[in-house]
Regions:
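Acidic/aromatic-lined carbohydrate-recognition and catalytic surfaces
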Residues: 35-244, 248, 261-320, 463, ...
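Hydrophobic residues within beta-strands of alpha/beta enzymes
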Residues: 98, 254-256
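Beta-strand-rich binding/interaction modules
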Residues: 550-566
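C-terminal beta-strand-rich structural cap/linker in extracellular carbohydrate-active enzymes
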Residues: 571-586
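Intrinsic low-complexity, disordered N-terminal segments enriched in polar/charged/small residues
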Residues: 5-6, 11-13
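Loop/helix patches that line or flank the sugar-binding groove of alpha-linked glycan CAZymes
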Residues: 36-42, 55-57, 272-285, 295-310, ...
Length: 586
């Protein structure tokens, strides 16, 4: 089949005739009733997806940013019950697993990545029973569940940190974190020159019980996120226990937040320059990508392997080279590591090919799959990144990039809403923003061009499910961030059944990926192609990508299976539109 290019314009408003409103209400009630019937009839004993050793090597995994996915109770914030009710959408999309962002007890200083209790569900998102129900429902639908674990830092409201603040300098409670005396005559200066990823110093000074200034503590992110000290045996034992807690509940693995950051260089040496966030991912730093993290990951691999069902660990690791990143996925370490080199790659055929070659060579050298990703909750959505000043161009390129990544060997991660072609929301009012980096960078006057720029809220706007309603079906009430009016036409309801829509393009691609044995993990070779064009061969399939601003004419590679834009043919040739990708059966 061939999918036509979809448009981003919102359709005309549905009529307000009472019969149509009644019909929509009836459909909504029916969908909810069917979902409830499905999920309440599950067996009481845990069910796991069919055993498939190495399932993760070519899995397509969908990231759910929980607070923005679906709201079940009308408070404007997504929750676990909302995710559970929408799992049939993900099963129908054709993904293999779901990754959930943190839903643990948290003051929400950084969207839940500041954890106060790693074994408790925050009431904002539901209960432990809701988490258990979600895992059971996902497994019944054939979906695996990966949850976030945040080991680099805790919340400043974690009992351990409260104990540390109450303890004396050098006390046992403080050894779980990084407390240091300041520099200067009176300790008035930070212990070193490290900067927070969110802007400003990476150190905050404490106040002793008698009111005098005390030691400083390290936080590579917000002050509300003190870094844990992984030299502490207590810290290591605690996280082993946390992992076992969630594995016992039935989760299939963990996405490890800041997997490159738990170990700091001995002595906490100065870096010697400012704007350190710009160095992340370009060189080894005293606080990131230290070799000592690998021993921790090896111990976690042993723990994961002690459970049945191929449970996995996924590294969020910023490394300067593909070779450094591959160290995280050696056979005795983690299973996957996000390929941020590919995410950062410009829309250029030569640059893409270089990153693909380097990535496949590096992971292949350790026997691991490459893990491709285009967007996540920390970066500008790729529909907007690729736009280069033209929203239509951005969507065309995003659709093409999706087909390219799904044709490459290895695993692929999708960020919620990319299957709808959602763009970044760039006009959120400052008073509604919640990203802590926004407040830090604004206060410090930083330009935010690298690292986390303080505008991550724009990729976290709640999803549109229906054409109408206060929050386009996100929940019974409003949404914690406002959705653009144009998102009516980008909703799941608006795109379902439209053969030219981005949603149906993703559904078609994922269905073919399951059907074609040559896709996923396995060999790949490059075919000859003109400048600006990529042509790659997989067993039984050819993928062509045109990154140019004009169409190119090629010999017909095979039988057209799927394309991100309409194709046209000559005598034995095909004209590939600009910024488009196509799959061909051979």
């Amino acid at each position: 089949m061939t999918c036509a290019h979809s448009t981003t314009g919102a359709p005309s408003k549905p009529t307000s005739a009472p019969c149509k409103l009644f019909r929509k209400a009836l459909q909504s009630c029916y969908v909810r009733a069917m979902t409830q019937e499905l999920t309440t009839s599950l067996p009481t004993e845990p069910v796991r997806p069919s055993e498939s050793p190495g399932w993760w090597r070519d899995a397509v995994i969908y990231q759910v940013y929980v607070r923005s996915f679906a709201d079940s109770d009308g408070d404007g914030i997504g929750d676990l019950r909302g995710v559970r009710e929408r799992l049939p959408h993900l099963a129908g999309l054709g993904v293999d697993a779901v990754w959930l962002t943190p839903f643990y007890a948290s003051p929400q200083a950084d969207g839940g990545y500041d954890v106060a209790d790693y074994r408790t569900v925050d009431p904002l998102f539901g209960t432990l029973g809701d988490a258990d129900d979600l895992v059971r429902t996902a497994h019944e639908l054939g979906l695996r569940v990966i949850v976030d674990v945040v080991p680099n830092h805790s919340s400043d409201q974690h009992p351990w940190f409260r104990e540390a603040l109450a303890d004396r300098p050098g006390g046992a409670a403080r050894t779980r974190y990084h407390f240091r005396r300041g520099r200067g005559v009176h300790g008035e200066l930070p212990p070193n020159d490290w900067e927070s990823v969110f802007g400003g110093p990476a150190w905050t000074r404490t106040t002793d019980p008698d009111g005098t200034p005390g030691e400083w503590y390290l936080h590579l992110f917000a002050p509300e996120q003190p870094d844990l000290n992984w030299d502490s045996s207590e810290v290591r034992a605690e996280f082993d226990s946390v992992l076992r807690f969630w594995l016992d509940l039935g989760v299939d693995g963990f996405r490890i937040d800041v997997a490159h950051g738990m170990v700091k260089a001995a002595g906490l040496p100065d870096i010697g320059r400012t704007e350190q966030a710009k160095l992340i991912g370009s060189q080894v730093l005293p606080f990131f990508d230290q070799d000592g993290v690998h021993e921790i990951h090896r111990s976690w691999r042993r723990l994961l392997d002690s459970y049945p069902g191929d449970r996995i660990g996924v590294a969020e690791a910023w490394a300067p080279t593909s070779e450094r990143l591959a160290l995280y996925v050696r056979p005795d370490e983690l299973h996957q590591a996000f390929n941020f080199q590919f995410l950062k790659c410009p829309w250029d055929a030569a640059a893409m090919r270089q990153v693909i070659d380097e990535s496949l060579a590096a992971t292949g050298s350790v026997g691991a799959p490459t893990t491709w990703v285009l967007s996540n909750h920390d970066v500008v959505r790729h529909t907007t990144r690729y736009a280069d000043g033209g929203p239509g161009r951005g969507l065309a390129r995003a659709r093409a990039a999706a087909l390219l990544t799904l044709a490459l060997p290895g695993s692929s991660y999708l960020y919620q809403g990319e299957e709808l072609g959602l763009p970044e929301v760039t006009d959120l009012p400052d008073e509604l923003r919640q990203d802590p980096a926004f407040f830090r960078t604004s206060a410090d006057g930083q330009d935010g061009q690298d690292g986390q720029d303080g505008f991550r809220d724009g990729c976290r706007v709640p999803l549109p499910w229906t054409r109408s309603g206060d929050s386009y079906g996100f929940g019974p009430g409003g949404s914690w961030l406002p959705q653009p009016d144009a998102w009516s036409g980008l909703s799941v309801e608006a795109q379902t059944g439209d053969p030219g829509s981005t949603l149906e393009l993703y559904r078609g691609a994922l269905a073919l990926r399951r059907e074609l044995p040559g896709l996923g993990d396995g060999p790949m070779s490059w075919l000859q192609a003109p400048a600006g064009v990529l042509a790659l061969s997989r067993p039984g399939l050819v993928c062509t990508l045109n990154t140019l601003a004009e169409e190119v004419e090629l010999p017909v590679p095979g039988r057209a299976l799927l394309s991100s834009a309409p194709l046209s043919y000559g005598a034995g040739t095909v004209r590939i539109p600009p910024d488009s990708c196509a799959w061909w059966a051979i």
